[in-house]
Amino acid sequence: MSLPLQIWLIEHYSKPGDIILDPMCGSGTILAACSLSRNVIAVELEKKFVEMTEGNWKRVQEVGPELGHSMGWAIIRQGDARQLAGVLADVAIFSPPYSDVIRRGNPGGPGASGKGKQPSCLACYSEDPSNIGNLPYGDIDVVIASPLTEAKENIGNTKGDTYLRAMRIVYQQCYRCLKPHGLMILVVKPFIRNQQVIHLERDTQKLCESVGFTFLEEHYRRLTHMSFWRTLYARKHPKVERVDKEFILVFGG
């Protein structure tokens, strides 16, 4: 998510003094909210990104007061977005990993080639197989129809797990973390799998509604540039529909 878009979402969907949750904070751009008198709980799975977030927090603390707002506080913790016990927030704002990766040998991913091969990722989120962005996508109808299992032994068990099943648990955790009348704002983008566009925004709406959220609004932002890997893919498959929008989905708790 771009920083200008994130700031717009912060200003539009939260107010000074609110606690904003980002359960997949990456390098911590959500910390910009602290310079706008909001408070932040930032959760990130991987240590290297936690360290980036901590470094960015130091910079925000240095330059934030110059913007003329009172500074909010931030809590940064390493953890899994599927386990958010003890968190309470007014708003959740984040961009889930949306599988915009190019893989070889992954039957469930873009660029699949052959059976039984190990995936070779050209642009993965991480080398950690438990990272949700690295899981095979899954089937939305199967996930919605299945019971929502929260047993601790299933968290992080990547065998048979899918992106959709994992994200359903994340959204359920966010639903439980939000105060009454809280909001969850997601920025998602369709992606291409097997030369077909997968409309992640539609599947995401179904996942969120299945755990209790009410869908409120949808906006989109037209993308003017493709990623490097997506540009290469487009050249190789010129007939495949271009993904040129990202969607902002707003849900009520």
Describe the residue ranges of each PLM region:
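Class I S-adenosyl-L-methionine-dependent methyltransferase catalytic core
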Residues: 1-253
